[in-house]
Amino acid sequence: MAATNIDVCAVVPAAGYGRRMQTECPKQYLSIGNKTILEHSVHALLAHPRVTRVIIVISPGDSRFAQLPLANHPQITVVDGGEERADSVLAGIKAVGDAEWVLVHDAARPCLHQDDLARLLTLSETSRTGGILAAPVRDTMKRAEPGKNAIAHTVDRSGLWHALTPQFFPRELLHDCLTRALNEGATITDEASALEYCGFHPQLVEGRADNIKVTRPEDLALAEFYLTRTIHQENT
């Protein structure tokens, strides 16, 4: 197993638009306080001493990123993304170099806690396949009838988890699994699903449920509340 003090490179896919936010500005560039959501997300990664480099994957022609202080940060590299998230993550991995382990974190997930990140990073010592931050499902889950807004039945929530990010894997393994899944036309919704497709079983590391992804307009106020609370706790 790898040592606990090895350097880690992070990949942040930030090429999405996020139409559900109902704004002209891509959600990662919306502001919470005096920083964009993307800046909050990246700074949470760089706050851990093992994360020494971040690859940010943006859309070709993105003119907003160059206006951020992140554009001149010595630990940040920017590359162009692809059509789908998996294409963008693969482009980021190719820019990582020879890092043994890679974190992948959503650009629009700004409320990552350092204790969750620290627990996830211990997988480089204990696991050969890596894992993800996740939160157990607490709500009652319903499956709809096909094509209808009608309940088919209640789903047993035991054993169900919400997949969060960061997700943390050996670089070569993630690269190979993403490449195979894309070449074979598999549906890849997150990085762990590429490993699952190839027969691996990444670990679930329980994380805080307030590590939310800003997807809809109401999420912005909630993320601002969580971030303000965290900053207050750190300063007291």
Curated annotation (Swiss-Prot):
GO MF: 2-C-methyl-D-erythritol 4-phosphate cytidylyltransferase activity
Entries under Pfam families matching the protein: IspD
Function: Catalyzes the formation of 4-diphosphocytidyl-2-C-methyl-D-erythritol from CTP and 2-C-methyl-D-erythritol 4-phosphate (MEP).
Domain of life: Bacteria
Subunit structure: Homodimer.
Site positions for Positions MEP for the nucleophilic attack: R157, K213
Gene3D superfamilies registered for this protein in UniProt: Spore Coat Polysaccharide Biosynthesis Protein SpsA, Chain A
UniProt keyword Nucleotidyltransferase, yes or no: yes
Keywords on record: Isoprene biosynthesis, Nucleotidyltransferase, Transferase
EC numbers: 2.7.7.60
Pathway(s) served: Isoprenoid biosynthesis; isopentenyl diphosphate biosynthesis via DXP pathway; isopentenyl diphosphate from 1-deoxy-D-xylulose 5-phosphate: step 2/6
Organism listed in the record: Escherichia fergusonii (strain ATCC 35469 / DSM 13698 / CCUG 18766 / IAM 14443 / JCM 21226 / LMG 7866 / NBRC 102419 / NCTC 12128 / CDC 0568-73)
Keyword Transport (UniProt): no
Catalytic activity: 2-C-methyl-D-erythritol 4-phosphate + CTP + H(+) = 4-CDP-2-C-methyl-D-erythritol + diphosphate
Positions bearing the site annotation: Transition state stabilizer: R20, K27
Entry protein name: 2-C-methyl-D-erythritol 4-phosphate cytidylyltransferase
Record-stated family: Belongs to the IspD/TarI cytidylyltransferase family. IspD subfamily.
EC main group: transferase
UniProt cross-references to InterPro entries, sorted A to Z: IspD, IspD/TarI, IspD/TarI_cytidylyltransf_bact, ISPD_synthase_CS, Nucleotide-diphossugar_trans
Gene Ontology annotations of biological process type: isopentenyl diphosphate biosynthetic process, methylerythritol 4-phosphate pathway
